[in-house]
Amino acid sequence: MATYAIVKTGGKQYKVAVGDVVKVEKLDSEPGSNVSLPVALVVDGAKVTSDAAALAKVAVTGEVLEHTKGPKIRIHKFRNKTGYHKRQGHRQQLTVLKVTGIK
């Protein structure tokens, strides 16, 4: 079995392994720079590590590949019988990371 980790960033958790490319909430890092993500769980074959003291020694590192935007989301608010319509759009800013190591 391969080694993988559950990392926390942007209020979400992602399952990552070395070499994975993931899109996460925008991070304040330049493309090409390295970042370290906090770990919630590490699985190494049959060995599962979830103890906070042991996880404090573990780090998942990744390289920022680019900053991009997610898909367009359309929001439409409507109130019946009043003529009230409100349209709004949103595109979440994302950071594309390549996981380089779980140490």
UniProtKB/Swiss-Prot annotation:
Listed SUPFAM superfamilies: L21p-like
UniProt key word Ribosomal protein: yes
InterPro entries: bL21-like, bL21-like_sf, Ribosomal_bL21, Ribosomal_bL21_CS
Annotated Gene Ontology cellular component terms: cytoplasm; ribonucleoprotein complex; ribosome
Domain of life: Bacteria
Isomerase listed as a keyword: no
One term of GO molecular function: structural constituent of ribosome
One annotated GO biological process: translation
Keywords, ordered alphabetically: Ribonucleoprotein, Ribosomal protein, RNA-binding, rRNA-binding
PANTHER family linked to this entry: 50S RIBOSOMAL PROTEIN L21 (PTHR21349), LARGE RIBOSOMAL SUBUNIT PROTEIN BL21M (PTHR21349:SF0)
Name of the protein this chain belongs to: Large ribosomal subunit protein bL21
Species whose genome carries this gene: Mycolicibacterium paratuberculosis (strain ATCC BAA-968 / K-10) (Mycobacterium paratuberculosis)
Species lineage: Bacteria, Bacillati, Actinomycetota, Actinomycetes, Mycobacteriales
